[in-house]
Amino acid sequence: MKCDKVLPSAEKGGISMAVYIGLITIGAAMTIETFLRHALLRRWYDLFLALPVWLGWFLAATALYFLLLYLLSLTVDKTKPVQKKSSFYRWLLNETAWLILRLGRIRIECTGLEKLQGLPPFLLVANHRSNFDPFIAIVACPRSGLAYIAKPEIFDIPITGSVVHKCFFLSIDREDNRKALGTILRAAALLRDGTVSIGVYPEGTRSKMGELLPFRNGAFQIAKRAGAPIVIAKTTGTEQIAHRFARRRTVVRFDILDVLSADTVAKMTTREFGEYARAQMLQSEPATSTKKEAITV
């Protein structure tokens, strides 16, 4: 099964990427014109002017794209809870995630995506190795409508904070148990109503050394309260993105390890969830997978 049969246009860039590429194409045309004009004049040393022309246009197109996103984000009031889905902001999130990975020269190799076909909204549980992890899952599973439970600082990031707020991402205060419980209940309600699928990192923070950190099993309460299935996934290689971004291609893996049905979830305790999910992540060996799907961005 090819990824282009599984993923919608957001994975391939869609409309915003078409506009972006259109601007780059204009820059390329200007570069060619400069090249030919100076070639006809036989001033070979002036041909080097073509590169700055194209580079300047590329940077201008990129800056314009993100400037428009920034201006749009200023219209979002992040103090008000989101009441209904926004197809526009979901589309924008998928497109921007794709563009960021494209600019970063990141290639995603996936296994197990076929397990998500026909699945109702679910709780996605995965390991956490990089700030790019949510982007990987969003691009790999654009039809799932993922919304993550994230630390409050994420919502202070320009553009990002506004877009994810409109897509039902939730802030969690780990220092205040009462507020944290409120976030868990809100996530369970969204999942139960079928509004979004919820993504969590039970480690609670990024693993800086690559090892799997102890789980905080409270996050599994979301699936139990919502009566929803749990999807166990593993991300590999994202810790390399930050120091290679745009300079070198980075290949990362996103593997769907197992899916626990809602009936199975109802019979297990949160501790059992944690132990099982952790064991799956530790025992998984992506290199032995027989069905691999590549998403080139």
Show which residues each predicted segment covers:
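Catalytic core of membrane glycerolipid acyltransferases/transacylases, capturing the structured
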Residues: 73-95, 102-103, 118-177
